[in-house]
């Protein structure tokens, strides 16, 4: 089940991030183009979650997966029609490769540390766990007035919403919070590198 959660996270963020290519030109560098799709997709996943919530559509992980796959299939078809499906010119940036290595080391450190003890970190984690389980079961981030959830509506519920959607793909709230919190803390290193690269040209 944990493997399904990891596949869902990366496939859905990448698929949603690929949608940006329909509207703006992407980088010519292979790594930058593909890695930034994860970052953009993560932001779009949160935006889409809020939109679905406002429209009273359940926050079901299968909806996000289907939309992501539709984007990827559409992109594949359009690239095939334009004969630009595969490119042998990868243009690997060695600095980007180094950042990926740093990300891998940082992720390992955070994941290893998170699972070194069998408890959640502090009071915030326990409060978030209530909201995450609520989103996973009820498939909504709106709990209504006087709810016992400290990090759902009216508080911006992005964290609990994202983790609640992911938690639908496995049966361990503990693992979901430990693993994906470590991943979410580590992955911005990649996005910050490309952000800094643009602003230091």
Predicted regions and their residues:
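Membrane-embedded, hydrophobic transmembrane alpha-helices
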Residues: 1-92
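Membrane-targeting and insertion segments and their boundary/processing signals
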Residues: 18-25, 99-106, 132
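Internal/C-terminal transmembrane anchor helices
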Residues: 89-110
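Mid-membrane cores of alpha-helical transmembrane segments in multi-pass membrane proteins
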Residues: 40-44, 67-70, 102-105, 125-130
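Active-site lumenal/periplasmic loops and adjacent helix-entry segments of GT-C-fold
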Residues: 104-201
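Hydrophobic alpha-helical context, especially transmembrane and signal-peptide helices
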Residues: 8, 30-32, 47, 101, ...
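Generic detector of bulky aromatic hydrophobic side chains
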Residues: 22, 47-50, 98-102, 126, ...
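Generic intrinsically disordered, low-complexity segments enriched for polar/acidic and small residues
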Residues: 11, 35, 74-77, 100, ...
């Amino acid at each position: 089940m944990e493997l399904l959660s990891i596949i869902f996270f990366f496939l859905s963020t990448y698929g949603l991030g690929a949608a940006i290519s329909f509207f703006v030109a992407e980088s010519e560098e292979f790594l930058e183009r593909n890695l930034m799709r994860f970052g953009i997709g993560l932001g779009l996943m949160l935006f889409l979650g809020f939109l679905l919530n406002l429209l009273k559509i359940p926050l079901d992980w299968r909806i996000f997966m289907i939309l992501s796959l539709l984007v990827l299939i559409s992109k594949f078809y359009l690239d095939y029609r334009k004969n630009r499906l595969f490119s042998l010119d990868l243009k690997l940036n060695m600095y980007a490769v180094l950042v990926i290595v740093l990300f891998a080391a940082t992720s390992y450190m955070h994941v290893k540390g998170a699972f070194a003890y069998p408890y959640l970190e502090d009071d915030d984690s326990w409060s978030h766990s209530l909201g995450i389980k609520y989103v996973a079961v009820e498939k909504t981030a709106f709990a209504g007035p006087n709810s016992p959830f400290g990090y759902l509506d009216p508080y911006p519920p992005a964290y609990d919403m994202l983790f609640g959607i992911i938690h639908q793909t496995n049966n361990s709230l503990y693992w979901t919070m430990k693993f994906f919190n470590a991943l979410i803390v580590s992955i911005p290193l990649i996005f910050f590198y490309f952000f800094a690269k643009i602003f230091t040209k």
